C-alpha cells in the first residue's frame, strides 16, 4: 500500500495541470468545435461544452482533445515510466474521461485508507457484519486504593449486554470482552477465599458477586465455544487450532478458575450449579491434558465425599468425559477407585445409600470401556487376594487379620460384585464377567479366615455377596453350606445363658456392623437379630435353587447337617424357626422329584429341558410360597425398625436442644420477670459489679443493627 500512495499523489497533480491547459485554450477554437460532443461513459452526465462542479462532469472541446493528445505523446517520450503507470492506474485520463471532482476523489481515497487501517486492526475472527452493529460503550471503571478495578453495576450491565446475546449466530464475539469477563470471574474466585494472586478486578458487593457468577455460568460456555469456532462432530466438539493457539491463555485461566471455585464453595446449590456449568465445558477440558487432570480430581472428590444431590451431577460430568473422550478413561477410573476406597472406612445408615450410589456408578463407568477396565479390575481383585493370602499364612496375626476384616475390604467386595453383575447383563463385557471366579474365591476365603463368633456379622455379609453373584451370574455357589457354618456359630453362642438387661437397649444395625462386641453378644435381643439374619440367608439361597432339577441332591446333605445342629440348640424359639425351614426344604424336594417323575427328560433336547424348568419354576411351589410369606413379614419389620430409629433420632435432637438451651446464657432480660433474679454465686456477682465499661467500641465485632431500617415500631 505504501508504494501505491506516492504515485496516486503524482497522478492528481498531473491531472490538475492538464486540465488547466485545456481551460486556457483560445475561444476561437472552442467556438468552432462546440457542436461535437464526447460520448457519455460510466453513467456520467452529457458533455455539453460547459464545466459543472455540482454533478461532477467536465466538458472538453475538439481542439482541446487534440492538444491533450499531443501533450500525452510528449509525456510518453520524456517520461515513459510515468506514462506506463498512467496506463495501468488511470486509463480514463488517457481516454479523456473524468470520474468526478478532485475533492470527491480525495474524499473517497481517504475513506478507503481509513477502511484499510480499520481492517488491519480487527481480529481475524470478527465477521464483516460488525460495522452494522451498534457499538456498546465500555463504562469508566473505578479503582480502589491498591489500584485494582472495582466491579460495580455498570460493569456488570456492560458484560451482560456483551455476553448474553439474543442472536448468537450473527453477533460476533469480541475477544477483549471475553478477556474482561474472565478477569472478573477470577475476582469472584478470589472473593470466595481461594489462595490465588491478587486479581485485576475486585468485587465488594455480594449482589454483584452472585449476579456475575450466575452470568458466567450461563453465558461463558457458549461464548468460549464461539470464540474458538467450535464445530460439533457426533458427540464430540472440535475447535479451530489457530483459535486455540491465539486464545488459550485466558481460556485456560477461566477453566482453572472454575476448578478453584468448585473446590472452595461448600453450599449444595452452588456446587450443583458449578458442576453443571463445568459439564458444558467438558469438551474444552478434554482438549487440555493438565486441565482434564484437575477436572477429574475435583469431580471425583465431589462424587466420593459430598451429598447425593451433588454426586449425581458430578457423575454426569465424569460419564460425559469418559464417553466422548476415551483417552481420559484410565486416569479417571484409577482416581475414582482410590477415592472410593479412601471414603468407605465408616458405614452407617446415612452413608449406605451414598456407597450404593458409588457401586452403581462405578459399574456404569466400567461398562463404558470394558477392555481398558478389565486390566485394572483384574489387578485390583488380585491385590485383595494378595492381602488375603498374607493374612491366611500369618498364623493368627491380628494386624493382618484386621487388614481384611474392615469396611474398606468389604465395600470393595460389594463394588466388584456390582460391577460383575452389571457386566453379565451387558453385551461386550465378557472379559469382566469372567472375573466372577476369582472374586468368589476371595469372598469364600474372607469367610473362612476367622471363625470367631464376634465376626459373625461379617460372615453374613459374605453370604449376601455370594447370593448377589449367584442371582446375577447364574453360577452355582454352595451358599447353603456356607450359611450352615453361620448356623453352627449361632448354636455355639446359644449354648451360653443370655444376660437379661433392664430397660430398652439400642442394638447396632447388623447391616452396618462387621464385629459384635461382647456387651451385645450375650443379649437375647441381639441373638434374636442374628438368628433372623441367618434364617434370611438360608431362605434366599434356597429360593435361588428352587427351580433347579438338582435341588433334592443339593439339599439332602444340608438337611442332615441342620438336624445335627438343631439337636445341640437349647433355645426352643430359634430351633422352631429352623425346623420350619427344614420341613419346607423336604417338601420342595418331593415336589421336584414328582415333576421329574411325570416327564421323561432327554438332556440333549433343549426344548424338554426348558419345559422341565418351566414346571419347576411354579410360583405355587412350597419354597416360593413360603418365601413370599417370609418376605412380607421381613419388609414390615424393616419399616418398623426405620420408623423407630427416626423417632429415636428426633428424641435425641430434642434432648440435645433442651440441654443446649439450658446451658445457653440469656442475652436479654424480660421486663415481666425483673423481680425474679437468677441464682448467681457470690464470686460471679462480684465480677459483674467490678467489671468496667468499655472505653472504646470494638471494631472487630460486626454491627448487629445493620438492618434497623427494616424494623417497625410494632416489632
From Swiss-Prot:
GO annotations of cellular component type: Noc1p-Noc2p complex; Noc2p-Noc3p complex; nucleolus; nucleoplasm
Highest taxon of source: Eukaryota
Gene Ontology MF term list: histone binding; transcription corepressor activity
SUPFAM superfamilies noted in UniProt: ARM repeat (SSF48371)
Keywords of this entry: Developmental protein, Differentiation, Gonadal differentiation, Nucleus
Signal sequence, renumbered to the chain: none
Main location: nucleus
Compartmental location: Nucleus
Regions of compositional bias (Basic and acidic residues) in chain numbering: 638-660
Example GO biological process: negative regulation of transcription by RNA polymerase II
Effect of disrupting the coding gene: Worms exhibit slow growth and sterility caused by germline proliferation defective phenotype (Glp) or proximal germ cell proliferation abnormal phenotype (Pro).
Pfam families noted in UniProt: Noc2
Residue stretches of biased makeup (Acidic residues): 89-128
Role: Required for normal somatic gonad development and for regulation of germline development and proliferation.
Protein family per UniProt: Belongs to the NOC2 family.
Protein name: Nucleolar complex protein 2 homolog
Species of provenance: Caenorhabditis elegans
Gene name of the encoded protein: pro-2
Amino acid at each position: 500500500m505504501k508504494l501505491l500512495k506516492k504515485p496516486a499523489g503524482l497522478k492528481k497533480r498531473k491531472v490538475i495541470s492538464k486540465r488547466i491547459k485545456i481551460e486556457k485554450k483560445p475561444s476561437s477554437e472552442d467556438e468552432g468545435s462546440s457542436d461535437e460532443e464526447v460520448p457519455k461513459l460510466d453513467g456520467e452526465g452529457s458533455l455539453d461544452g460547459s464545466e459543472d462542479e455540482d454533478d461532477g462532469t467536465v466538458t472538453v472541446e475538439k481542439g482541446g482533445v487534440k492538444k491533450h493528445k499531443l501533450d500525452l505523446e510528449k509525456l510518453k517520450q520524456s517520461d515513459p515510466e510515468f506514462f506506463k503507470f498512467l496506463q495501468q492506474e488511470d486509463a480514463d485520463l488517457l481516454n479523456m474521461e473524468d470520474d468526478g471532482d478532485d475533492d470527491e476523489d480525495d474524499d473517497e481515497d481517504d475513506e478507503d485508507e481509513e477502511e484499510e487501517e480499520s481492517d488491519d486492526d480487527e481480529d481475524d475472527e470478527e465477521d464483516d457484519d460488525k460495522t452494522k452493529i451498534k457499538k456498546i460503550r465500555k463504562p469508566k471503571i473505578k479503582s480502589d486504593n491498591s489500584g485494582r478495578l472495582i466491579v460495580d453495576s455498570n460493569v456488570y450491565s456492560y458484560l451482560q449486554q456483551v455476553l448474553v446475546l439474543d442472536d448468537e449466530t450473527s453477533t460476533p464475539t469480541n475477544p477483549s470482552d471475553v478477556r474482561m469477563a474472565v478477569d472478573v470471574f477470577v475476582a469472584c474466585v478470589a472473593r470466595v477465599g481461594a489462595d490465588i494472586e491478587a486479581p485485576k478486578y475486585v468485587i465488594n458487593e455480594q449482589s454483584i458477586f452472585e449476579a456475575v457468577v450466575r452470568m458466567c455460568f450461563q453465558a461463558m460456555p457458549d461464548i468460549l465455544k464461539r470464540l474458538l469456532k467450535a464445530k460439533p462432530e457426533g458427540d464430540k466438539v472440535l475447535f479451530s487450532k489457530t483459535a486455540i493457539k491465539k486464545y488459550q491463555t485466558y481460556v485456560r485461566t477461566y477453566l482453572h478458575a472454575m476448578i478453584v471455585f468448585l473446590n472452595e464453595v461448600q453450599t449444595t446449590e452452588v456446587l450443583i450449579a458449578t458442576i453443571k456449568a463445568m459439564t458444558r465445558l467438558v469438551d474444552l477440558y478434554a482438549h487440555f491434558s493438565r486441565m482434564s487432570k484437575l477436572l477429574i480430581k475435583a469431580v471425583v472428590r465431589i462424587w466420593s465425599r459430598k451429598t447425593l444431590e451433588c454426586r449425581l451431577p458430578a457423575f454426569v460430568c465424569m460419564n460425559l468425559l469418559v464417553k466422548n473422550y476415551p483417552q481420559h478413561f484410565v486416569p479417571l477410573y484409577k482416581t475414582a477407585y482410590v477415592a472410593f476406597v479412601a471414603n468407605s472406612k465408616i458405614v452407617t445408615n446415612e452413608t449406605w445409600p451414598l456407597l450404593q450410589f458409588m457401586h452403581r456408578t462405578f459399574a456404569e463407568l466400567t461398562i463404558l470401556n470394558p477392555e481398558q477396565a478389565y486390566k485394572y479390575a483384574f489387578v485390583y481383585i488380585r491385590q485383595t487376594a494378595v492381602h488375603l493370602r498374607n493374612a491366611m499364612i500369618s498364623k493368627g496375626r491380628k494386624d493382618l487379620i484386621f487388614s481384611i476384616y474392615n469396611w474398606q475390604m468389604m465395600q470393595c467386595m460389594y463394588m466388584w460384585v456390582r460391577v460383575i453383575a452389571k457386566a453379565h447383563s451387558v453385551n461386550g463385557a465378557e472379559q469382566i464377567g469372567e472375573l466372577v471366579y476369582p472374586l468368589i474365591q476371595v469372598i469364600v476365603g474372607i469367610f473362612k479366615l476367622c471363625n470367631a463368633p464376634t465376626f459373625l456379622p461379617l460372615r453374613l455379609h459374605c453370604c449376601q455377596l455370594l447370593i448377589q453373584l449367584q442371582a446375577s451370574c447364574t453360577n452355582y455357589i454352595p451358599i447353603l453350606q456356607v450359611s450352615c457354618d453361620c448356623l453352627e456359630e449361632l448354636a455355639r453362642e446359644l449354648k451360653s445363658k443370655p444376660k437379661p438387661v433392664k430397660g430398652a437397649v439400642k442394638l447396632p444395625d447388623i447391616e452396618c456392623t462387621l464385629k459384635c462386641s461382647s456387651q451385645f453378644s450375650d443379649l437375647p435381643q441381639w441373638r434374636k437379630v442374628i438368628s433372623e439374619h441367618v434364617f434370611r440367608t438360608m431362605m434366599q439361597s434356597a429360593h435361588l435353587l428352587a427351580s433347579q432339577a438338582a435341588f433334592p441332591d443339593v439339599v439332602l446333605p444340608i438337611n442332615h447337617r441342620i438336624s445335627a445342629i438343631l439337636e445341640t440348640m437349647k433355645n426352643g424359639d430359634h430351633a422352631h424357626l429352623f425346623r420350619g425351614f427344614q420341613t419346607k426344604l423336604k417338601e420342595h424336594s418331593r415336589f421336584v422329584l414328582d415333576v421329574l417323575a411325570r416327564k421323561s427328560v432327554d438332556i440333549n433336547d433343549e426344548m424338554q429341558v426348558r419345559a422341565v424348568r418351566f414346571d419347576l419354576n411354579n410360583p405355587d411351589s412350597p419354597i416360593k410360597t413360603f418365601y413370599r410369606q417370609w418376605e412380607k413379614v421381613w419388609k414390615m419389620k424393616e419399616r418398623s425398625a426405620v420408623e423407630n430409629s427416626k423417632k429415636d433420632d428426633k428424641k435425641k435432637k430434642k434432648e440435645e436442644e433442651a440441654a443446649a438451651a439450658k446451658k445457653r446464657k440469656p442475652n436479654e432480660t424480660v421486663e415481666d420477670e425483673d423481680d425474679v433474679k437468677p441464682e448467681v454465686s457470690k464470686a460471679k456477682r462480684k465480677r459483674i459489679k467490678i467489671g468496667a465499661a468499655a472505653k472504646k467500641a470494638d471494631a472487630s465485632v460486626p454491627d448487629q443493627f445493620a438492618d434497623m431500617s427494616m424494623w417497625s415500631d410494632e416489632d
